[in-house]
Amino acid sequence: MKNISTIEKHIGNTPLVRLQRLPGNTSNIVLGKLEGNNPAGSVKDRPALSMIVEAEKRGEIKPGDVLVEATSGNTGIALAMVAAMKGYVLKLIMPDNMSLERRQSMQAFGAELILVTAEEGMEGARDLALKMQADGKGKVLDQFANPDNPLAHFKTCLLYTSPSPRDQRGSRMPSSA
C-alpha cells in the first residue's frame, strides 16, 4: 500500500481485493473493498467525514464548535476521530449497555461520553442530543436524518464508477457492469 500524507486522505482509500471463489461457473470479476482498513476501522469513516465536511461547506459548523451526536458504535468512533482531526469538541450520547471497547475507542480520540439508560436506548440518546442542541450546548449532525450520511457511501463506495475503486483498478476493467 502506498504512503498517504494525512489520515483524512486515507479515509475510503482502502484496498481492493479480487474475490477468488465465486459460486457457479462465471468469468465475472468481483472486487471487494476492505473497509475495515479505514483509520477508525470501519466503513463508517466515510459518512463521519462527509457529515462534518459538508456541514462545514454549508457554514453550519466550524473548528472549535461543540458537536453532539447520538451513537451506538462505529459512527461514533469515526466521528470522534474526524472531530479530533478537524478541531471539534465532540460529545457522544449512547445507551449504557454499549460495549466498553466502543466507549474506550471514542474516548481515546477525545470524545466526551454521555450515557443514557439501556431502557432509554438510542431514541433517548437522540432525544438528549436534540435537547442539548435546543439548549445551545452543541450542534447535532444527526446521522439518522442527515442525507450526507448515506450520500457518502453513494458518492465514494457503492458506485462502481466512483473515484476510489475506479482509480485503484485502472483502465483494465470496464466502468459499468
Question: Can you say where each PLM-predicted feature lies in the sequence?
Answer:
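PLP-dependent amino-acid enzyme catalytic core
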Residues: 1-162
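Single conserved hydrophobic/aromatic residue that forms the stacking wall/gate
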Residues: 160-163, 167-177
